[in-house]
Every structure is written in C-alpha cells, then in structure tokens.
A protein has these predicted regions:
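Beta-strand elements of well-folded, non-transmembrane domains
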Residues: 93-97, 112
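A solvent-exposed, acidic/Ser-Thr-rich amphipathic alpha-helical stretch
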Residues: 5-6, 11, 24-83, 89-90, ...
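Short helix-adjacent coil turns
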Residues: 15, 22-23
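Extended, polar beta-sheet/loop recognition surfaces of beta-rich domains
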Residues: 142-146
C-alpha cells in the first residue's frame, strides 16, 4: 500500500472506531456536508446532519453496543483523481459486541475526497451480500414480508 492509500484507509479505521464507541458525532465528522449515505436496504441519508442524527438514533437504539467487523480480504483503494478515491471493502457487524451475525455481511463502497488537507467520505453504499438465485442473504434465512 502507498502512503496515500494508507491515509484513505485510516479514515475507514476512524469510522470504525467511532461506530464501535457509539459516537454519532465522531462518525459523521468523517463525511462531507453534502455526503450521500445509502443503507443496505436502499434508503439514502443525504447530508452530514442527517447521517449524524440517524446514527445517533441507531447507536442509542437497535445498534447500541454493535461493533463493525472487517471481512472479505484487503480493501481495494483506487484513485480516480489525485483527490478522489474509491474504496471497496467487505464487512459486517456484531450486535451488542457478540459474534458477527450471519446474513449481515456487506460489500461497502466509499468515495472519499481530499479537502482541507484531509480525506472525507462524499458517498457511501452498504450492499448486503446475498445469493440472488436463492433469494436468501448469504448466511441468513429467507425473509418475507407479512
């Protein structure tokens, strides 16, 4: 890895640290003011303030005590311009600090921009890993509505 790739990956490490501490303000501080955050179920949370308030509610509610878990090998870091990086990595979460929950594995895509001497996330997408042929999330059971 180059120094610049390591700078970008350090931001992802800081995001994980903030998540694991349940600190919504620290988590959101790594996003640009106009960032887009697309959840695993396709909802877009536009803007820094929305990302912070949504994560505060999550960290105080259903994701209290959850921890991020890396997975899927080394993250891929690609610079599309010197000040724009795309990172694709794997990951998941454990609830209440336990073992990773089957069916929560994701492919994570980040677009980071360098501004004011540091890297910030301009766009993020969390895509759950699934088996489209079976309609079942990998490691999980078939889920239906109703």
């Amino acid at each position: 890895m180059t120094d610049r790739q390591n700078e970008v990956l350090a931001v992802l490490g800081e995001l994980a640290d903030a998540w694991n501490a349940g600190d919504a303000a620290a988590y959101a501080s790594h996003f640009t003011e106009d960032a887009d955050y697309v959840t695993f179920f396709g909802m877009n949370m536009p803007g820094h303030a929305t990302i912070e308030s949504a994560h505060r509610a999550l960290f105080e509610g259903p994701l209290r005590g959850s921890k991020l878990v890396s997975g899927g090998g080394e993250p891929k870091v690609r610079f599309v311009r010197p000040d724009v990086a795309i990172v694709v990595s794997g990951g998941g979460s454990s609830l209440s600090g336990g073992e990773p929950v089957p069916g929560r594995e994701s492919t994570l895509t980040y677009v980071l921009v360098e501004e004011s001497g540091g890297w910030r996330v301009a766009s993020f997408q969390n895509t759950r890993v699934s088996d489209p042929a079976a309609g079942v999330p990998m490691g999980g059971e078939r889920r239906t509505l109703g």
